Amino acid sequence: MALKIVIGGDNAGFNYKEALRKDLEADDRVASVEDVGVGGVDDTTSYPNVAVAAAEKVARGEADRALLICGTGLGVAIAANKVKGIRAVTAHDVYSVQRSVLSNNAQVLCMGERVVGLELARALVKEWLGLEFDPQSASAAKVNDICAYEGA
């Protein structure tokens, strides 16, 4: 099943957001890409506004996953996690990206343009697209506990 992806970033993540958006649009595993990020490096829209807009689309079922880029990947993760039902993670290595989906069923991947090189970011997104959570896994009960606490 091809994924519907929403992508966003603030001005500190604009360049990577643009490069990764193009990569996503060219990937056969992606049905559509919606960009809710800033329009340029001079656009001062704050990262919480971008992150919440993307996360809300995932929470409403308008997108399967979101990719968020800011300077560190931390602020967008904090903001996205304020949206009920969203599990957003900051990950800058393959293992963490894998576990974010396989163990935590995270729908939102966050990265920092100032923290990770572009080629690694591209490789991580490519890996992320191929991962799918198994609702029968040992981790499913833990994810259900998170959802129950949140009331999602």
From Swiss-Prot:
Annotated protein name in UniProt: D-erythrulose-4-phosphate isomerase 2
Protein's pathway: Carbohydrate metabolism; erythritol degradation; Carbohydrate metabolism; D-threitol degradation; Carbohydrate metabolism; L-threitol degradation
Gene Ontology terms: biological process: carbohydrate catabolic process; carbohydrate utilization; cellular response to carbohydrate stimulus
Phenotype caused by lack of the gene: Cells lacking this gene are totally unable to grow on L-threitol. Cells lacking both derI1 and derI2 are totally unable to grow on D-threitol or on erythritol.
Pfam families in the cross-refs: LacAB_rpiB
Gene field: derI2
Active site feature: 70
Gene3D superfamilies per record: Sugar-phosphate isomerase, RpiB/LacA/LacB
MF terms in GO: intramolecular oxidoreductase activity, interconverting aldoses and ketoses
Listed EC numbers: 5.3.1.34
Family: Belongs to the LacAB/RpiB family.
Keywords associated with the record: Carbohydrate metabolism, Isomerase
Reactions accelerated catalytically: D-erythrulose 4-phosphate = D-erythrose 4-phosphate
Transmembrane segments: none
Top-rank taxon, per record: Bacteria
